[in-house]
Regions:
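Glycine-rich phosphate-binding loops of nucleotide-dependent enzymes
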Residues: 2-243
Length: 243
């Protein structure tokens, strides 16, 4: 039986010349849930996610994924274990069609099996709602549809853990609603770590919320529990009426 938590960190710390970006962060990520990581600019979210994904090595502490200590593994090795991290750096090929972009991503695991490769590409396009745009050149997509395509590229790799970094940033209100529905659908098949500033999106999607403050873990719980936490209200959210 799989462990309840797909990922855990212990004492995770990152220092830059004596300045601590993260300090002794003990964090757990429940399997097949959406966990939101929130906090203001400078709270240490990007550094923490960098250490989880392998883009940044910790000064001390450990990261365990599926029970394996991956603290020293680079990002590409973590991808091979089942992590996908999107929106920080786009991997879209603008001159290729939507279908070709997804096919390239799916081919990282399925290039040896032509039928499975084609089936996976079609299934991903259907799941994320881009089947009717499969022949469209990526550079011609709207901003919102490009964001959806970026999700498709991660989904095509069958991630066990999908890290979504500010997926609703820059989207119109209607596009945000569509993204919320999409994330709920994704959570049926994978674990999601969501880095998000939009509190409405967090409230509508997250099963669990973790709050960072000045590099430390400040609070963790359901959205309602975090919202009611006076320290969180003071540090990030204002009064409950403003959330």
């Amino acid at each position: 039986m799989a462990a309840v938590n797909i990922l855990e960190t212990k004492g995770l710390t990152k220092s830059y010349g004596g300045v601590h970006a993260n300090i002794d962060v003990d964090f757990v990520l429940p399997r097949n849930k959406i966990t939101a990581l929130i906090g203001p600019n400078g709270a240490g979210k990007s550094t923490f996610v960098g250490m989880v994904s392998g883009r940044t090595l910790p000064t001390r502490g450990t990261v365990h994924f599926e029970g394996q200590d991956i603290s020293g593994l680079p990002a590409h090795k973590r991808m091979q274990l089942g992590m996908a991290y999107t929106f920080q750096i786009t991997s879209i090929f603008p001159g290729l069609s939507v279908e070709d972009n997804v096919s390239l991503a799916a081919g990282r695991k399925l290039a040896h099996d032509k039928a499975a490769h084609a089936a996976k590409t079609a299934a991903v396009l259907e799941k994320i709602g881009l089947s009717d745009r499969s022949d469209q050149i990526a550079s011609d997509l709207s901003y919102g549809h490009r964001r959806v395509l970026e999700i498709a590229l991660g989904l095509a790799q069958d991630p066990k853990l999908f890290i979504l970094d500010e997926p609703t940033q820059g989207l119109a209100e209607g596009e945000v609603d569509a993204f919320v529905a999409l994330m709920r659908g994704l959570a049926e098949d994978t674990t999601i770590l969501l880095i998000e500033h939009n509190m409405r999106v967090v409230a509508d999607t997250a099963d669990h919320v973790t709050v960072l403050d000045q590099g430390r873990l400040l609070a963790s719980g359901s959205f309602d529990e975090v919202q009611a936490n006076t320290a969180v209200q003071s540090a990030y959210l204002g009064t409950p009426a403003n959330v």
